[in-house]
């Protein structure tokens, strides 16, 4: 039965959509940049838990009273009861400042559940962490290229990497636009997204390869038909998989605590983007590339002299 919607024939619209998102992302980066956590820049994180829903205005007043005014993105509230406070400060706190914060906490919130927890990172450690995070992502991408090139072919590998870059860019743009904090859990989420997306893409590529062996397309139209059929054959599997993982990620986002909120938020965006790119970006790119090779081969055959 012929599929109701020809994904490959409509691929130019998906490319335009992704292109528009990419342009919007570049604009967001240029205007806002990233809200880096102390993992990637020097500074301090202060965390404590109250026995009530966090009154943000009073927390800001508490820090202002000791000469540490908070910016718009410096205060994060989490916890199931919204009673956990995490404050990011650009400077490394001294022992005196930490004592002043503890005294201010007892003064403003005498019934607080726990004492102040402070985590400080110096510039050298932050720089090293940022560099290692970039290396981790690049190493993962390189290993993926090699694996797909060996198992399938080089065109499949490049198409898959383009889809992965698309997913990573979508997540990065969302964090820049929403001013979400980029920390080490974000890097972990990015690597998780890469793993999920490439797994989904490999399943699709494997189905395409099997159908190519069976149908043996000789023209571009036949190639497009085979790939389109393959995409619809794995569509239900892809949708069920992403929905299953999404449900778990959403539950973690709301009930998993403040420490993994950035991880789960990035995961939610990346899962949706990964499911989209595996079907609507990676495979159409491969088809466009393979079609060009087939057309060149056809023109070469026509131009070849007829043997006497």
UniProtKB/Swiss-Prot annotation:
GO molecular function terms attached to this record: protein-transporting ATPase activity
Keyword Cell division: no
Membrane topology, as annotated: Multi-pass membrane protein
Subcellular location: Cell membrane
Keyword list, A-Z: Cell membrane, Membrane, Protein transport, Translocation, Transmembrane, Transmembrane helix, Transport
Transmembrane segments: 14-34, 134-154, 158-178, 185-205, 238-258, 267-287
InterPro entries reported for this sequence: SecD/SecF_arch_bac, SecD/SecF_bac, SecD_SecF_C, SecD_SecF_C_bact, SecF_bac
Any Gene Ontology biological process: protein transport by the Sec complex
Main location: membrane
GO cellular component, one term: plasma membrane
Top-level taxon in the UniProt lineage: Bacteria
Subunit structure: Forms a complex with SecD. Part of the essential Sec protein translocation apparatus which comprises SecA, SecYEG and auxiliary proteins SecDF. Other proteins may also be involved.
Cross-referenced NCBIfam families: 2A0604s01, transloc_SecF
Function per UniProt: Part of the Sec protein translocase complex. Interacts with the SecYEG preprotein conducting channel. SecDF uses the proton motive force (PMF) to complete protein translocation after the ATP-dependent function of SecA.
Family the UniProt entry places it in: Belongs to the SecD/SecF family. SecF subfamily.
Name under which the protein is recorded: Protein translocase subunit SecF
Lineage, highest ranks first: Bacteria, Bacillati, Bacillota, Bacilli, Bacillales
Gene field: secF
């Amino acid at each position: 039965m012929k599929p109701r919607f020809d994904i490959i024939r409509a691929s130019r619209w998906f490319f335009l959509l992704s292109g528009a998102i990419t342009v919007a992302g570049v604009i967001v980066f240029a205007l806002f940049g990233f809200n880096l956590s102390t993992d990637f820049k020097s500074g301090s994180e202060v965390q404590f838990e109250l026995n009530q829903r966090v009154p943000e205005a009073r927390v800001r007043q508490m820090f202002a009273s000791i000469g540490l005014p908070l910016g718009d993105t410096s205060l994060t509230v989490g916890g199931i009861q919204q009673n956990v406070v995490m404050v990011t400060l650009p400077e490394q706190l001294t022992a005196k400042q930490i004592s002043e914060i503890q005294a201010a906490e007892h003064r403003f919130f005498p019934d607080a559940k726990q004492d102040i927890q402070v985590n400080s990172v110096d510039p050298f450690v932050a720089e090293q962490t940022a560099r290692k995070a970039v290396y981790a992502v690049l190493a993962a991408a390189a290993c993926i290229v090699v694996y797909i090139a060996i198992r399938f072919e080089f065109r499949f590998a490049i198409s898959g990497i383009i889809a992965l870059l698309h997913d990573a860019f979508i997540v990065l743009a969302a964090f820049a636009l929403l001013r979400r904090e980029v920390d080490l859990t974000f890097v972990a989420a990015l690597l998780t997204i890469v793993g999920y997306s490439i797994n989904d893409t490999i399943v699709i590529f494997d189905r395409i390869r099997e159908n190519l062996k069976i149908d043996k397309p000789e023209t571009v139209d036949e190639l497009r038909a085979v790939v389109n059929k393959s995409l619809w054959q794995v569509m239900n599997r892809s949708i069920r998989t992403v929905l299953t993982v999404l449900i778990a990620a959403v539950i973690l986002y709301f009930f998993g605590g403040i420490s993994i909120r950035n991880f789960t938020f990035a995961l939610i965006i990346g899962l949706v983007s990964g499911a989209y790119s595996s079907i609507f970006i990676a495979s159409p790119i491969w088809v466009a590339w393979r079609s060009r090779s087939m057309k060149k081969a056809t023109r070469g055959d026509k131009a070849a002299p007829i043997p006497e």
